[in-house]
Amino acid sequence: MKYIGAHVSAAGGLANAAIRAAEIDATAFALFTKNQRQWRAAPLTTQTIDEFKAACEKYHYTSAQILPHDSYLINLGHPVAEALEKSRDAFIDEMQRCEQLGLSLLNFHPGSHLMQISEEDCLARIAESINIALDKTEGVTAVIENTAGQGSNLGFKFEHLAAIIAGVEDKSRVGVCIDTCHAFAAGYDLRTPAECEKTFAEFERIVGFKYLRGMHLNDAKSTFGSRVDRHHSLGEGNIGHDAFRWIMQDARFDGIPLILETINPDIWAEEIAWLKAQQTEKAVA
């Protein structure tokens, strides 16, 4: 079964994220559990936790259908010790918030070397950051997102994801989220079913579907291999509809949150309905 949704706003209270997801007939959703552009957040209150859990129960969202995202400020591979410590503390807080909310996944961007350390050193720091956070939490899986490779961001090659996973001690609590726009911008073609097969065969060989814990379904304003992260509405960008139809018809993407971060929230309900409909369309030739 496919879990399909969008990254919805939690403005006015975390419970509102579940309500907004239900309003667009989503069977999955993503959210920030705190302001994603601030380091600090007030601790979750018992009321906030209870209201969130009640809303999820009311609208039938289990933790398997929810993909929280951490703060954009966090860099788990930071080259400077003090800044790395700050990011690690913030990441632990994000993991603990998920734990309190009964959520089992936390999606994050791996990190950046900022042109100050090698890729290898940065990837090792990211893995160690994950190890530290896993040691201090229970029941939450760290879900590494592939990136477009803008600037000095790592995670744009499947090999980067594999290297991070290799450095994580508890393999049962690490996974990946593949963003289609990021993959395309990083040079993984998805424009035809044949290219999708090729790209995900490479993913299986290097990382493995056993680690796939979520997807971000985004078309791309950015061009192929441009290393530029610019999302677009499904079918409106340079990837086109075929990739998303192909994903919907492949059982390897069952049972994980498939999340839209497309640029027009006004048509999310339409995009979700279209994705759902592709599951029963004639298989892509």
Curated annotation (Swiss-Prot):
It is an enzyme of class 3 (hydrolase). InterPro entries: AP_endonuc_2, AP_endonuc_F2_Zn_BS, Xyl_isomerase-like_sf, Xyl_isomerase-like_TIM-brl. It comes from Escherichia fergusonii (strain ATCC 35469 / DSM 13698 / CCUG 18766 / IAM 14443 / JCM 21226 / LMG 7866 / NBRC 102419 / NCTC 12128 / CDC 0568-73). The keyword Zinc applies. Endonuclease IV plays a role in DNA repair. It cleaves phosphodiester bonds at apurinic or apyrimidinic (AP) sites, generating a 3'-hydroxyl group and a 5'-terminal sugar phosphate. Its cofactor is Zn(2+). GO terms for molecular function: deoxyribonuclease IV (phage-T4-induced) activity; DNA binding; DNA-(apurinic or apyrimidinic site) endonuclease activity; phosphoric diester hydrolase activity; zinc ion binding. It catalyses: Endonucleolytic cleavage to 5'-phosphooligonucleotide end-products. Binds 3 Zn(2+) ions. Keywords: DNA damage, DNA repair, Endonuclease, Hydrolase, Metal-binding, Nuclease, Zinc. Its EC number is 3.1.21.2. Zn(2+) 2 binds at E145, D179, H216, E261. Zn(2+) 1 binds at H69, H109, E145. The keyword Nuclease applies. Zn(2+) 3 binds at H182, D229, H231. This is Probable endonuclease 4. GO terms for biological process: base-excision repair. It comes from the Bacteria. CDD domains: AP2Ec. It holds the Pfam family AP_endonuc_2. Belongs to the AP endonuclease 2 family.
